[in-house]
Amino acid sequence: NEKNIILSGSVLVENFMDIDLTEIKLLKKVVVSNVNHSIVLDKLKENLIHFDCPIIEVISESNEELINDYSDQSTLGVDRWLAAMGAWKIYGEDLIVINAGTAITIDLIQIDQKRKAHFRGGMILPGIAISLGILNNSTNLIDTEIGQSQYPSLNTKDAVTTGILTSIQGAVNLVCKKLPSDLPILLSGGDADLIFSQSEDDWKSRIKIESDLIFEGLMSYV
């Protein structure tokens, strides 16, 4: 029986090298999404060399399923591309794709008159953790934990949290106003639940949370 193994983040960097590869009898293909340093890919190739199987590093270029409309496809982050691929694979329709991770990306997929799917691009905002880190480094804030989103806020933690989440809401509202009101919104990433909880009612009903959207996109290359 063929099986797929999906490893992510620190699992790949720290623990994957400790797996007893002798227990794996056959590898037909390895598909890698790497947004950091090439050292990760080099280590992976070194550990898998005796399997003599192709190692495919996903790049953000057009394929038969989805056309990348970016002016320079090579500059599109592979995580954004895979989220779009995963969204299209699951739903196959016009939609907004929000990936809330280190950065928050709000992207658009549209089908043209020839029924071809296009990644139209979108916008990028600092993620919640990055925003907290920037404020902490610039203003010497002591507390960088997420607080309550409420206005007016009566303490710094809540005031910062309210500001960050309100900026994200504002960006999503802007996108929603520019596009058809019935367009589905796919929300993924580590902060998806937090953003969903703070969403406004007029577009909250359109949101579908897909926790493994990037991995769904990765499976398109298996």
What are the roles of these predicted feature ranges?
Residues 100-102, 155-156:
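Internal, active-site/partner-interface "lid" segment
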